[in-house]
Amino acid sequence: MFPPDVNAVFDHGKRAVSSFPIATGSYYKWDYSAGVDISRYANIPVPTSYMAINSKYDFVGGYEEHIKSGLLHVADHHVNAGKKQWTWGNGDFGQAWDRNLTDEDGPYIELMTGMYCDNQPDFTWLQPYEEKSWVQYFMPYQEVGMVKNATRDALINMESAGEGKVKVALYMTSTHKQVRVLLTAGECVCLDKLVSVSPANPYVDVVDCNASPDLDGLELTVFGEDGKVLVGYRNAPEEIKPLPEAAKAAKLPKDIAHIEQLFLTGQHLEQYRHATYSAMDYYMEALSRDEGDIRCNNAVGLLLMRKGKFADAQPYFERAIKTQTERNPNPYDGEPHYNLGWCLKMQGDNDRAYDAFYKSTWNAAWQDAGYFGLAQIDMLRGDYEKGLEHIERSLIRNWHNHKGRQLKATFLRKLGAFDEAEKLIADSLKIDLFNMGCRFEAYLLKSARGMEQDAVNVKAELKEMMRGAVHAYLEYAIDYAAAGLYEEASALLQFVVEDNERTYPMVYYALGYFSSLAGDEVAAKRYYVKAESMSPEYCFPNKLEEVLMLNDAMRVNPDGAKAFYYLGNFWYNARQYKDAIACWEASVEKDDTYPTALRNLALGYYNKQKDTGKALAALEKAFALDMTDARILMELDQLYKKLKYPHRQRLEMLERHAELVEQRDDLCIERITLYNQLGEYERAYDLINSRKFHPWEGGEGKVTGQYLFCRMELAKKALEEQRFGDAVRLLKETEKYPENLGEGKLTTAEENDVHYYLGCAYEGLGDTERACRYFSAATRGSDEPAIAFFYNDQQPDKIFYQGLAWRKLGDEAKARSCFNKLVKHGEKHLFDNVKIDYFAVSLPDLLIWDDDLNVRNKVHCNLVMGLGYLGLGDKAKAKRFISEVVNLDINHQVAVAHLAMCD
C-alpha cells in the first residue's frame, strides 16, 4: 500500500519501471498489458519487487482485506524516501516459499522502508564522525482499509461507496474522546462530527454527499481536541504524469568523453557497491588524461585507504593537494588535507599528520573531523590543555560526535577536572545511552577518585549493556588507542578476557599491538602467541587498524601462522589478491595442518591466478586434513566438476562420504544430478522422493531441474518401449511439484518439451484429440533464442520442441522457422564477448569457482545450432555441434540427452 500520489514504481537499481497501481506493460517478465492492479498481492503471479518513486506522503503499509487489519509505517518522507514491497508471487512458486518462510503457511510479503535512500541499492554518504538519525513509527491498524494519509496520531481513508456516497474511516493510535471529523466538497460541508475514537474502536461512517465515483474535490480533515489538524487528505483530480525513465548502464571508461563523468560514474559505483564494475577503472582512466585531477586523486586515495593500502594512498592525496594549491595555498575544500592527515596517522607519521589535519580545519566543513584528529595526537603527545581546546572546537562543529565526547571526558580526567568530566558524561548519555566510551570513561573516573564500589557498579552495568559483543569492545578500544591511550585500551579489552580467556583472536592481537605501541615488545609477543592459540572460527578481520595489528604481530612473532592467515583474509576481501595469496602461502609454510588456509589458497590459485593444478592440490590436501567438513567436500566436488572429472568418479567419492553429503542440500542435489547423468534415473527418482529440500538464493531451480529431468528421461524411455500410459503418468508428475522439493513451479515456466512428449504419449494411445491439444500447447512461448543465465530464463531447447510440435501439427514451415532461428542465433553470437548484465543484483548461480562467460556462450551457441540442425534433419551437423557442447562441458545434461537423438 503506497501513498495515493505514487504513479510509478522502480525495480532494483531503477533498471525497470512500471506504472502504478495499474501496470500496463511487461514487468518481471510478466505481461500486464491488459491493465492489472499490482498493488494487490493476488494479482502478482511471479516473484516481484517494486519501489515507489518519490512521494510527498509520510507512510507506507499493507492491508489484509479478509481480516480488515494492516500494518503501517510512518516517517518523515524527506528522509524516509524509500518505500518497497517484495513478494515471491501468488503462484505455485510463491506459495512454496510461503510454506518455507511463514509460521502458518500464509502469504509472505516484505515491506521495506529506506532512510536517506529511495531505492535498493541506494546508499547515502556518512562523513567522518557524522550521525544520521530519524524517527519512525510502526503500527497495526484495523477497519480503515487502503489508507489515504497517516501521521503518528491518526490514519484516514475515504472511498466511494456508490450512489454518491462516501465511506469515511478513521483509526487513531491513542484514545481521543472528542475529535472533529470534517468532510467537505468545496464550500459544501458533507460531514462535521465530534467522535470518540480509540485503537480498539475506529470510526467508520458512510456519508451521502452526491460525490462522483472518483471523489473529485472531497477533503477529509481530522482535528484534535485542541483544534489542531491531526491528519487530512484532499482527493486530487486524476492527472496523467510522465513515467520516469529507467536507469541506464554505465559506459565503459574508454567510452566516456569527460573527466567529470568518469569521476561521477566511479563515485556512483562506489556508492552503490557495484558487484562487477570497478570504480577504480574510471578514476584511473580520468587520471590517465589528467594526472592532477583533484577529485579523482582524492577518490583513488580513499579507495586505497579502505583497502588498507595506506602508503599507496598517500601520493594520490598529495597530488590532489598539489593541484589545489598551485595558485592558492588556501584551497576551497579541505577534504584532501584531512584525508592525507588520516593516511599519515595510520602510518605513524603523527607530526606530518598534525600539519595536514590543521590545514583541513581552515575549511568549516572539515573542522569537526580535523580538530578531532588534532586532539587525538595532542593526547598521544600528552598535551592535554591544547587537546582540550581542539576537542572543544570539534564539538562546537559536531555536538553529536560521540567519540569526541568520550575524548573530551578523557582530557578532563587527565587534567583532574573530575566533576566536569562526570557532568559531560551524564550529558552525553542523555544524548546516546549506549555511548560505551563514555561509560568506560565513567568507570575510569570512579577508579581515579577512589570510589571503588561505584567503579564496580559502573563496570557491571557497562558489561551488561555490551552483552559480550567482542567487536564492540574492539571498536572502543581502538578509539582509545588512536589517541595513544594504550593502557586504557588494554584495560577495556581485559573486560573481555576476564570473562572468557578463550575469546576472539583479534582481542589478543589488539592487546599485543597496544603493548607494542607502548614499548613493551615482551608483553606484545606474549599476547601474539596467545592469539595464535585461539580458535580461528569466524575470525575475519575487517577493520583498518587490524591490518596494523596483524603486520606488527608478523614482525614481533614471525613464526605465528595465524596472523598471516587472518591478514590474507582481510586482503582477499579488499580485493588485494596478490597480497592475500602471499599471506596464505606464508601461513601454510609455517603450519600446513590448517585446512581453511589451504582451502582459501585454492580459491586464490583458481580464481585469481588461473592455476588449476595448485588449486586442486591445495583443496585436496585441505579435505584430507578434515574429512568431516561438508563444505570443503562440496567445493572439492565442484572443482572436480569444473575440471571435467568423470561422473562415475565424482559419484563414487560422494558415496564414500554419504554422511557428509546428507548434511547439505547442494551435495544431495549434485549426487542426484550424477545419477541422472549416468542414466540411473530410477535411483535419482528415489533419492529426490526421499528428502525434504530447502531452497536457497542462488540455488533456485536446482532440485526441480533434476526432478523434471529424471521424469522426462524415464518418460522418453517409456515412449521408446511403447509404455504410453507410464509415459503419461511420469509427465503428469511434472505438472505440480511435490512439497518435499521446497520449491514451486514458476507461473512463467516454459514446458514445451513436457507438452510435446505428452502429445507423443497420447498419440501412441490413439487419443488424437488430447495429442493435438498438447502439441498445440507445446508451440506456445517465445521463439526468439537467448542465452539463459537465470533460473527463470527460457531454456533454448524449448524452441526446439516448439518446432517439433509444429511438425506434428503439420505446419512444416513454422517448424523449420523455429529450427532456422536456432541455427542463425548460434552463428550470429558464437564469437560474442559476454559480460554479466550491469544491473544484475545476483549471479546466476552460487559460484565458488570462476566461470568463463565466453565459454558458456560458446556452449549455448553450439547447443542451439545443434538443436536447429537436428530439427532440420541434418544429424551429422547436429552431432558435431552438440558434441562440441559436451566437449566444453561434460556436465551439460540437455546436450547429453539430445546427443543420443543424433544417431
Q: Residue locations for each model-derived region?
A:
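Single-residue signature of alpha-solenoid repeat helices
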Residues: 279, 313, 353, 387, ...
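Long, contiguous interaction/recruitment modules in multidomain scaffold/adaptor proteins
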Residues: 149-257, 436-438, 452, 513, ...
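A contiguous, surface-exposed recognition patch within enzymatic or periplasmic domains that forms
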Residues: 2-131, 139
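Short coil turns that delineate tetratricopeptide repeat
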Residues: 291, 325, 331, 365, ...
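Start-of-helix register in tetratricopeptide repeats
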Residues: 260-261, 295, 335, 369, ...
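Residue-level recognition of tetratricopeptide repeat
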Residues: 267-268, 302, 342, 376, ...
